[in-house]
């Protein structure tokens, strides 16, 4: 068909392009005149294609059509007028001229919300359904016969922009094309509009957008979102006109502590809180407003209303003003359809796309001597004013982290001045626990108090979960693409590496880790873990699946892997940073947010890690850390309805309780890495020296505080005595001492209660008849030091043969030469199945044993050889689920199946 397109905007441009792709001949485009030298996108596109473009300032005068305008239109010979978005009044002489008449797009479900502000009124009235109508133009106001309608659900927090961008724009374009197709085929319906339920509302203007406070909270919320962003719902307060944006009724778990904001006519004063401005309806229900615009046009987070915005108040130097103007020119080049880049100009609302973000970052790099901005910097400061403030702060060397106040405990240790945060970390801020409750964390080397640490309460858990949920659902973390998320995790690994000596020193101070080991393992593997999973971020993908076709139609099924949401991670005390990293890296790579409960006795590296997330630019609320007791913090995380996954490493007893709580609360996804009694089988045909070396490591590594420590060594009869002799010789060479000394092999146990359990464990072994070859007692010196211990003649029925010590205690049992199946039966006679090992030169025997051992990991002629790429996790009552490797990602993802029919 020959079509005349009458209208404007990006919407009109897209409709025009799609009609041409359909093969229609657009004989002319009628759009608005250029404004400040800038042409409308529809006109620009048509001019590129050589289509005649007309820019009449008006079509009629004194109620009569202008003859010269009508003549130019009629000369085109259009068969159909398409009006995708038109702000001009088109005379009926033009509307009725084509053979097929004229069709108009209207952004509501007619006959409801006739008039120019249809989207606004859809939201203001709280309609549950929205949509658009394409109708045949007549001489009434949106009263013509219906051709096509499509509807969508209106979400509780939808605004004009979100509803338009999500549905009305993309589906409206398709709808216009479909309508023209129906007309061309001769099947387009003409359904008279019913007057039943018809409404007409006037155009929303600033003067009519004042908030009426004498109504319920939901009505106030609908008014605010219905006027967001234009014209903006406003009220008078503090002697000026305040305009509110970004309203929500989702206020669960929100604290009302803050500073009162008196509002004339309101049922109750508003409250400025850390989350934003809480408002109340006349029904005493709350709503939350996140952004406020002042009378001078300045936009700020509502939470900063009484503080002002430091970034907005920066006074620029002459050089910085010159840079700002150069950047303004860059914005003008990127946004050709914006008449003028003003302070309030929004980069994305002005038509910028993700490719333009890359361009802006690169242009700024050239303008500012190589200054490296990140893509997410643009997303966090979308207005020109905000972007310039962010840019100037970067140029001055001021980081966002400076806005976060961090209180430290400082200690001069290991030739370093340690700065250790000691408060809870919630929503990107270090805060006191409810009631300012604290507890002492102890240095196991001498039993002294390192510092007092905030002790999280149940209400603190609720706040942290709310912060994580907000970051997941509405924050930057859920909006950036996977590759940018990976870049942030790479940066976090780099920041951790820059602070590795400090982290290792804190591990030695708080957990008793030998410094040289902590540097390589506790911290080194933590860094490797974040780097490994950073690389996975943009490689998480689903599959396409062939299914039976619904003939004569066809089907396509695909799967998507999605983050589960807010995750709770509960970590043990033996590797405070490494266990945090094993779980958190996979969790974040999958796109989740997290609330972490470090072990109560070892909180300090986790809190230092929290500080490093700020330095790395991880958005606020993505990571939250709560030192505290398992009975309060761990239990509340397990019970919380907004937590969708728990990852736990710890005892089997506690793991069972967590699993039960997860089931009873909301059937959370759960992964458990629990107790172990890992068998190590040493055959006579092994490399004995290597077996001794690795056997020592399998038990005494990290003072025996090792999940996969060899809980029981089975040594073949013919080499048993020689093996024991060599082990004792090696034990005698071990230096027990201060973990910060570089030649120390064996540091203190993690905490006093654990030390006492090890003493009792050894006493029970002796009482039951096992031979104590060496050790078995506390070292006579200050601190929680325990002697490396060796037991022999351990029988299968003994307590120490069945139960985990989690300490530096080697349990040795003999087995008859050549009796492979018997020793396998003994090795598997346990409810645990975390790890295992075998030493032999016979590859056939090694593979046979590895097949039969009931454990998640089998080491052959080595031990403790974990790697970030190798899945780690147990069988039986050692738990289920995996840390590390690609398999770990699946613990923090859910699979969605999508099926199409076409």
Swiss-Prot record:
Cellular component terms (Gene Ontology): cytosol; protein-containing complex
Chain sites annotated for binding (6R)-10-formyltetrahydrofolate: 88-90, 142
Domain spans labelled Carrier: 318-395
Residue numbers binding NADP(+): 571-573, 597-600, 630-635, 650-651, 673-674, 757, 804-806
Phosphoserine sites (modified residues): 9, 629, 631, 825
Enzyme class per UniProt: oxidoreductase
This enzyme's EC code(s): 1.5.1.6
Residue ranges of the region described as Aldehyde dehydrogenase domain: 417-902
Major localization class: cytoplasm
Site, as annotated: Essential for catalytic activity: 142
Catalytic residues (UniProt): 106, 673, 707
Subcellular location field: Cytoplasm, Cytosol
Modified residues (N6-succinyllysine): 38, 660, 767
Comment on protein domains: The N-terminal hydrolase domain has an NADP-independent formyltetrahydrofolate hydrolase activity, releasing formate and tetrahydrofolate.
Family: In the N-terminal section; belongs to the GART family.
PANTHER family given in the database record: ALDEHYDE DEHYDROGENASE-RELATED
Subunit description: Homotetramer.
Designated name of the protein: Cytosolic 10-formyltetrahydrofolate dehydrogenase
Organism: Rattus norvegicus (Rat)
Lineage summary: Eukaryota, Metazoa, Chordata, Craniata, Vertebrata
């Amino acid at each position: 068909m020959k079509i005349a397109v009458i209208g404007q905007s990006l919407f009109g441009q897209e409709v025009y392009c799609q009609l041409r792709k359909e093969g229609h001949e657009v004989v002319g485009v009628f759009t608005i005149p250029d404004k400040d030298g800038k042409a409308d996108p529809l006109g620009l596109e048509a001019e590129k294609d050589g289509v005649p473009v007309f820019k009449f300032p008006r079509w009629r005068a004194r109620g009569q059509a202008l003859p010269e305008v009508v003549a130019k239109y009629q000369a085109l010979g259009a068969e159909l007028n398409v009006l995708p978005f038109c702000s001009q009044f088109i005379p009926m002489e033009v509307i009725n001229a084509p053979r097929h008449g004229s069709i108009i797009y209207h952004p509501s479900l007619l006959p409801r919300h006739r008039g120019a502000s249809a989207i606004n009124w859809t939201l203001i009235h709280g309609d549950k359904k929205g949509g658009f109508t394409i109708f045949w133009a007549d001489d009434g106001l949106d009263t013509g016969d219906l051709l096509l309608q499509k509807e969508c659900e209106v979400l509780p927090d939808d605004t004009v922009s979100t509803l338009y961008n999500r549905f009305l724009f993309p589906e409206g374009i398709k709808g216009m094309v479909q309508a023209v197709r129906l007309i061309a085929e001769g099947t387009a319906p003409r359904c008279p509009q019913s007057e039943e339920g018809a409404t007409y509302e006037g155009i929303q203007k600033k003067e009519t957008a004042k908030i009426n406070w004498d109504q319920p909270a939901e009505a106030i919320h609908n008014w605010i979102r219905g006027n967001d962003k234009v014209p903006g719902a406003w009220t008078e307060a503090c002697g000026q006109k305040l305009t509110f944006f970004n309203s929500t009724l989702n206020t669960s778990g929100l604290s009302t502590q803050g500073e009162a904001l008196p509002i004339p006519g309101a049922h109750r004063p508003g409250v400025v809180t850390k989350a934003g401005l809480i408002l109340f309806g006349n029904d005493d229900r709350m709503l939350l407003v996140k952004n406020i615009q002042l009378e001078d046009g300045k936009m700020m987070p509502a939470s900063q209303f009484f503080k002002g915005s430091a970034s907005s108040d920066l006074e620029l130097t002459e050089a910085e003003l010159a840079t700002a103007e150069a950047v303004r020119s860059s914005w003008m080049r990127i946004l050709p359809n914006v008449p003028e880049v003003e302070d309030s100009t929004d980069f994305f609302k002005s038509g910028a796309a993700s490719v333009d973000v890359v361009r802006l970052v690169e242009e700024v790099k050239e303008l500012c001597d190589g200054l490296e901005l990140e893509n997410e910097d643009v997303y966090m400061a979308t207005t020109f004013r905000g972007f310039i403030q962010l840019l100037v702060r970067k140029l001055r060397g001021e980081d966002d982290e400076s806005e976060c106040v961090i209180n430290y405990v400082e200690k001069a240790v290991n030739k370093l001045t340690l700065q250790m945060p000691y408060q809870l970390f919630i929503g990107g801020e270090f805060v006191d626990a409810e009631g300012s409750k604290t507890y002492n964390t102890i240095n196991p080397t001498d039993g002294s108090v390192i510092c007092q640490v905030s002790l999280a309460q149940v209400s603190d858990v609720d706040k942290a979960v709310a912060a994580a949920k907000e970051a997941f659902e509405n924050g930057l973390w859920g909006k950036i693409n996977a590759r940018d998320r990976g870049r942030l995790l790479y940066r976090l690994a780099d920041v951790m590496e820059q602070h590795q000596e400090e982290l290792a020193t804190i591990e030695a101070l708080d957990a008793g880790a030998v410094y040289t080991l902590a540097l390589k393992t506790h911290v080194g593997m933590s860094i490797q873990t974040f780097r490994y999973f950073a690389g996975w971020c943009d490689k998480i993908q689903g599959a396409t699946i062939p299914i039976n076709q619904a003939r004569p139609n066809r089907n396509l099924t695909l799967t998507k892997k999605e983050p589960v949401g807010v995750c709770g991670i509960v970590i043990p005390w033996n590797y405070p940073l490494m266990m945090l990293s094993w779980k958190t890296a996979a969790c974040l790579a999958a796109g989740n947010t997290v609330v972490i409960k470090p072990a109560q006795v070892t909180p300090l590296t986790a809190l230092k890690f929290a500080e490093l997330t700020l330095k790395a630019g991880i958005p606020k609320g993505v990571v939250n850390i709560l030192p505290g007791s398992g009975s309060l913090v761990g239990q509340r995380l397990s019970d919380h309805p907004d937590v969708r996954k728990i990852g736990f490493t710890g005892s089997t007893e506690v793991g069972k309780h967590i699993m039960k709580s997860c089931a009873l609360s909301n059937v959370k996804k759960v992964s458990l890495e629990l107790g172990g009694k890992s068998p190590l089988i040493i055959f006579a045909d092994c490399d004995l020296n290597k077996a001794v070396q690795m056997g020592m490591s399998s038990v005494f590594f990290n003072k025996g505080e090792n999940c996969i420590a060899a809980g029981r060594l089975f040594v073949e009869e013919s080499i048993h005595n020689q093996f024991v002799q060599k082990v004792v010789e090696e034990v005698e060479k071990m230096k027990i001492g201060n973990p910060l000394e570089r030649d120390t092999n064996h540091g203190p146990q993690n905490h006093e209660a654990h030390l006492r359990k090890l003493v009792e464990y050894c006493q029970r072994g002796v009482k039951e008849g096992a031979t104590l070859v060496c050790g078995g007692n506390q070292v006579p010196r200050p601190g929680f030091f325990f002697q490396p211990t060796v037991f022999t003649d351990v029988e299968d029925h003994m307590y120490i043969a069945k139960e985990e010590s989690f300490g530096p205690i080697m349990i040795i049992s003999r087995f008859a030469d050549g009796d492979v199946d018997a020793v396998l039966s003994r090795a598997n006679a346990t409810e645990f199945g975390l790890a295992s090992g075998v030493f032999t030169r016979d590859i056939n025997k090694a593979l046979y044993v590895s097949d039969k051992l009931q454990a998640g990991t089998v080491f052959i002629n080595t031990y403790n050889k974990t790697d970030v790429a190798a899945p780690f996790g147990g069988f039986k009552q050692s738990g289920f689920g995996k840390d590390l490797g690609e398999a770990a990602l699946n613990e923090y993802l859910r699979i969605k199946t999508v099926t199409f029919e076409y």
